[in-house]
Amino acid sequence: MDDLLKVPEIVTNIASYLSTVDYLSFQQVNKRVYAIINGKNDSKYWSLKLTRMGLQQVHSNEEEEITLLDENDNQNSLRIFEIYKSFTAQNSKKIFVKFYRCYNSYARKLYNNNLANFFPTSYSNDPLKQTRILNFIKKYNFSNKNDIETFTRIETNFNILREIFINSVLKESELNYQSNNLAAVARFMKILLISNEESNAIEFFKSKADLPPSLTVLPSNDELFWAEQPREEDSGGSTVIFNSKNLDTFLNQLRDFLNEKIKLADILFKDEFPVILQFIESFIQDILLDILNNILLSYSEFLKENGKDSKANYECVPELYFTFIKKFDTELNDSVNAGANFRKVVRDLLNLYLEPFVVNYMNQTTRVFESLINSQLANYDTQVQDKQREQNAKIYNTLKDQTDASSASNNELPNDLSIITETSKTVPEADSKPSTIHQSVHSTDISNDKLDFLSSFTKIFKFSNNENQRLKQQLQLAYNLNLISNNLQNIKSLISLDLCYKILQETSEKTDQIYKFHTIESLLPLIKLRCQEIFKILITQLNKNHVKPAFEKAILLLQKYNPNEIEQIEIKFNSLSPANTQVEPLVQFTELINIGDIILQMISIFYKNELIPKKIIDKNKDFLNDVIQLKKNFETSIDDFVAEGLNIGINKLMDEISFVFKTLQLPDDYNPPPPSRNSPIRDIKPTKCAIRVVELLSNHCFLLTGATDKGTIDVYQQEIGERFFNEIVKHLKKCFISTEGAIWLICDLNYFYDFIANKLKQKNVVPYFVGLKSIGQLYIISGKDSKELGKLISDLGKFNGIFTQEEIYEFVQRRSDWVRVRKDVEKVMYGLGIRDCCIM
């Protein structure tokens, strides 16, 4: 044994496992052991004990001055850990001696399991001091960890003592709570917190905050919900689901219960331990969510009882959410225990647990909104089709009744049966209101008679000689033409502005309902996404199921419309008067354009006033958003339809102008017969054909005014002007024009120019008609001045650069005396005539 103690490592290792008393005794074994342990090894032993107690070792070259405590001071045990928080290797033993003198007596009692009269008399009636002493004893015992047997024995008995102490504290807390001595209970709660018994403190508080079962019993469905949901003025047009009075009464009890517990927590814990937040979270999770689910279930049953879709119970989520926020956040009392951010934390907790319900509401709202819009548009389409079928049946039955009556009265075709060809056009007056111009077969006007005759003539030979078959063919023809006319009149009804406005209102309401939840920060990206989906549904449904089909049908009707066919056929019998049916494709299509433009403007207003201010769409990054692309595609689609429809309309207008030129422009308009003694004097003014053509132009060129943007109007009017110019050119190249008739040609050309320059006012088109006016000079020059005529043809500047010399040559060929003047004209133009060729 003596040999072992001569080895320093063995001596040092043995010393490190000894208790304080044994270590001091081991130093006294012999001088050699003392020499080995003393010095740095001794400082290391005491430093390790202090470190295990929680003190911090600092490095210093000089030994610090130790403030000695009065050994007779009974308060040393309560203050020593506050005084000594650090040490150096040099003073470690001296500092440990101070702790040893304070707590070793307690450690010996615990080691010997002597728990009776454990605390000194001065601490016996002060549980708060006892708590602090117990905490310090536990820390002190860590210094014995090198002697595991001593440490474990003391630790075991300490835990027994501490458990007895905690139980006595809880018992005293209960007794004082029952006697309503909350101040005493608060002191005991503080003892539990100092003892690191937060869980016991929380459980004690929860045991005094149990919710009475009666407060969770919901009112009956009849008391809680409205059978007929009234509108609420302040709710943005949404319906009120709950009986607010009964719902408030029910929730107010829960709110008052929470306020009582907030007050209790403030008394018992003050701001030392935030027990109320944990309690409120448990209340939300265990009570409020259960109540919310029960309300949703009750509402489903209520809907089912009232013959409605029970799956629509999600509709009550917004009202419940904001009511819960109001009752269990806004109307809660301030809490000292929870701190200054109490309300924010409570709202965050409410949002956390209510978030799944809100997400489901937004998802369901988006899905149902799409279904609703689709249903509304489908219903409107069905109504339009039903109405159209009724109108078609009415037209057919009316015509059939007339035909049957005629057939029954006489086997021959009745004298009063007539096929009336009537041309009616609706054109804008100065105030943009439609006016109808009628042309009747009974007119004495020769030109109108000719037009009506030629129009009817194309059909009359198609009728069978068999009387019944003939009447059937007449009926079928009349029905088809009245049907086309009726369809054209109904073009503007293909799009319902009222329905679109209603859908936009519903879109705004749904967007507002979803955006109300924007205070839930974690849901803000999803809220924006759902609002964008609502807007996308609006555009997609309107385009796919309403606007696009309407324009496609309107364009199809325009394509089928032939202004040169019979526009109205009426079968009259006895006293039946003719019906006035108007065919006005461009007018009706223009109104459709106007409606489409209004819809686009409403969508743009909604976008600018709803989506941008609420930052649902970032205007600085909108080019990256598919919503904006969808909106632009919708606008482009309407623009394309408008362009296509207007192009077709212009084609039909040009066809009609061409028809007027062919039918109303009499051969003697520009090539009158030689005057005789009995022939009337003809006024120098535009021909009836020119007047009718300008009337058609006037009725159609200004249809778009106020219906769309100025750029579209300008393009439309310029296109009409240019194509009208081409129609005049083609028409003139087919006419024979005499020197005597040239004066009326010039009148017509001036009349056309006046309309283009002073009414249409499209600067790009005016030069064409300036050049066209000069064409009249080709015919006013007498045949005797044929050389002057040749010079005029060669002077291209006279025609404003509009026509080439070849085109002017074509015009001059329409002179009635061209055969006589041709030689002189060509000689001036080309220098030599054919007869001047010596070879010929």
UniProtKB/Swiss-Prot annotation:
Organism superkingdom: Eukaryota
GO cellular component, one term: cell tip
Location of Phosphoserine modifications: S409
Entry keywords, A to Z: Cytoplasm, Phosphoprotein, Protein transport, Transport
Other comment: Present with 2700 molecules/cell in log phase SD medium.
Function: Involved in recycling plasma membrane proteins internalized by endocytosis. Required for recycling of the v-SNARE SNC1.
Assembly notes: Interacts with SKP1.
Protein name as annotated: Recyclin-1
UniProt organism field: Saccharomyces cerevisiae (strain ATCC 204508 / S288c) (Baker's yeast)
Gene name, Swiss-Prot/TrEMBL: RCY1
